[in-house]
């Protein structure tokens, strides 16, 4: 039983092993076959893909070669065209050069021909010159034999005869031309001047050395005088103007040769009357304000004068100085009005003569600018004015017209300067325009003030009481009481030496020392 079982078991094992081996071989063959087929297929596909890529690469290479070939052919054609164009240009230039060479050769041939002709003519001329020279020598010898004079003597005689004849003729012609020119110039000048005078119609008021201020009541006179006269003394000291309070009802007369001082005094007095507070400290404050306001008015007056005449571009400082002329007089004639009149006359006459009208008006307006500062600077007003104009960038033509209008630095050399001189004479020579007596009086007062101002330590000097008194303000820090007395004597002595005058002149030297303290 067990043997059979064992036998069956062994048989089963053999049968199972054989079956397994058979099945294994069969399956292995199948797998191997599949793998071979797969490998063959992969190889085939790889071969096909490689061929496709090869074709694609070949195609791309062919395309690139084709494109490069096209580009090369295009570039070649372009360069061929450019070379063709350049070749044509070179041909044209070559043809032109050939033409030029031909023309140059022709000209050279012509020049050679002309040179030959000239050389022939030169030889002929030399021959003729020699013939003429020999003939002239023969004739000179014959003339010397006939006249008994040498060549030099004959030349000198002929020259003297021609010179005398020419001189006589030219002198005769010059006399005729000069007479004609003088007659024409005089007639034309009279026409131009008459024209200008008729066209100008400026108003004129004679200037005086006094100004009247109307008071609201008679009581105001006492307030102006103040206790023991301190207010009126403060007014006269601050303004340099003589305040005359007399029996004239409700009127105070201000007397001073300087119109600017009178104007400051008038403005200050009117403001004090309106304000009501009249005492020395207030007087000084108001006078300072009035001086500042007058400086503004002076500039405005100068600007208005330039606007009225139509002159622009003048330096602001010259405009300010021009405004000061409104407060200066020359033989009672207001200098600013005189300058405006001269500018107008200059412009009118310049238009007749064809001279620059704007320059003529400018020179006429500025011709007396030096009179605004001639009391501060030594010298003639014409020379001072020329220096001012030059300082503030006026042209040489304007400067010359200013300095030459009184011929102090030579005669006028330009038409503009002559116009200014003529217009100045016309404006000043009108009947009633100027009064000699008042001008000499004003100059005497100016001289008095200048004498006092020459001394060291003098701050201000005023000539008042019609020149019968000089009030001198000195600096308290630089001059003591004893020196004040000596200064007074020195000024009086200098006036006696320098001036001739009737009666006597009182010299008052004022030294004021102030001490100011504040209670806190």
UniProtKB/Swiss-Prot annotation:
Q: Name one GO cellular component term.
A: plasma membrane
HD domain location: 335-429
Q: Where are the transmembrane segments?
A: 3-23
Its EC number is: 3.1.-.-
Gene3D superfamilies in UniProt: 3.30.310.210, Hypothetical protein af1432 (1.10.3210.10)
Which topology term describes how it sits in the membrane?
Single-pass membrane protein
Spell out the Pfam families in the cross-references. Answer: HD, KH_1, RNase_Y_N
Main location as per UniProt: membrane
| PROSITE patterns in UniProt | HD (PS51831), KH_TYPE_1 (PS50084)
Query: Where in the cell?
Result: Cell membrane
Please name the InterPro entries in this protein's record.
HD/PDEase_dom (IPR003607), HD_domain (IPR006674), HDIG_dom (IPR006675), KH_dom (IPR004087), KH_dom_type_1 (IPR004088), KH_dom_type_1_sf (IPR036612), Ribonuclease_Y (IPR017705), RNase_Y_N (IPR022711)
Domain (KH): residue spans on this chain? 209-272
For the biological process aspect of GO, one term held by this record is: mRNA catabolic process
Keywords of this entry: Cell membrane, Endonuclease, Hydrolase, Membrane, Nuclease, RNA-binding, Transmembrane, Transmembrane helix
Superkingdom classification of source: Bacteria
Q: Which GO terms describe its molecular function?
A: RNA binding; RNA endonuclease activity
Role summary: Endoribonuclease that initiates mRNA decay.
Q: Which family does it belong to?
A: Belongs to the RNase Y family.
Q: Which protein are we looking at?
A: Ribonuclease Y
Specify the species.
Lawsonia intracellularis (strain PHE/MN1-00)
